[in-house]
Amino acid sequence: MRIAVVGTGYVGLVTGTCFAESGNTVTCIDIDADKVKKLSKGEITIYEPGLEKLFLRNLREDRLKFTTELAGGVKDSLLIILALPTPPGGDGSADLSAILKVADDLGKIISDYRVIIDKSTVPVGTAEKVQTAISANCKAEFDVVSNPEFLREGFAVEDFMKPDRVIVGTGSQKARKIISDLYAPFMRQDNRIIFMDERSAELTKYAANSFLATKITFMNEIAILCEKFGADVDLIRRGLGTDERIGKRFLFPGIGFGGSCFPKDVKALVKSAKGVDYEFKILQAVMEVNEKQKLSLVPRIKKYFNNDLKGKKIAVWGLAFKPNTDDIREAPSLFIIRELLKEGSQIAAFDPEAMANTRRELGENIELTGQYDAIKNCDALVIATEWNEFRTPDFDKMSSLMKRKVIFDGRNVYELQKMKELGFYYESIGRKTVSA
């Protein structure tokens, strides 16, 4: 099939590349001329494990192309996929301006049947708005389909190529057949396409992300109780996770969730609920707890240093909001760093992939350096992201480099007994403090 993907951000680039990998001819469209130029030359613009290899192969075999021209990009494409940003507005609602602008433009371009697929995370009723926007200037037949993505950053290629389910919202039998053919290469062992109406598909995406955010937040609340009661959240996590009704995933406590999806989608669903006169109290609590959790290490650090952080060198390991990505959007690390800077701390940080993005976000306010260079003469180390590189470091080297053997672990990377044996002062989430 010939496919056009509008938007070359995280979702758009993964979607375009993976559909090209299954034999389709894909044209990706973006208004950012510099990005299009880089992609056309084989310079990938995001970090995602396994993506670059597929990207370069399909670019080389001419199945993957890039352009800034919407009309030319969609000219011969039966399928037009919208993978556009829906950033939160000041009130938390999703900003649909990019999607509706493209829909309006498509209405002036389309002259024969097309299937418009919305992969962006959008409020309920967006498919109808896209339909209306296109129809205002278009006499040709077309269908608008809601097909939300469920890609985990760090596992996006795997999730796309081997999906646990594909949600498709459409009332058109014609579009349903085309979408079934599109996903057939990914469904060779089991047909996991779930068809429903557009509104249900749109809400499914919000419901999924909000539920996972709630699960994380619940465990963070349990972790707080563990600290007050003297219990161990890791043991409780195992006790909960072995219950098949609950499951093992998303039960790890920490310093809150970040990224481009969970914070934005929870806020958007709360706002959407208010639009139909419903107060979504659980999700309001999720937002409140998560904002506090992001900064939960800061008062601990201040307490350790008797509320005097001026001139203290704090090392930070981990900047991305999660491992295996360079995405720092809403990353807890940034919230912590900004607060520590306000207190007069000097920050030296390391991340395997996210340092370039962090430099653009924080400028020259912090030192970005190597993993062990960051801890030279540091007064304390903060672990903000659970990269595998941090799980088994050279502890002897750490001991010799650090001014004080003090660790504040926001991701529970290390075992308490190990820290005790090595003589570290160690604070983590929902577990007892190890004193040196």
Could you describe each region identified by the protein language model?
Residues 1-436:
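Structural/interface elements that position substrates and couple domains in central-metabolism enzymes
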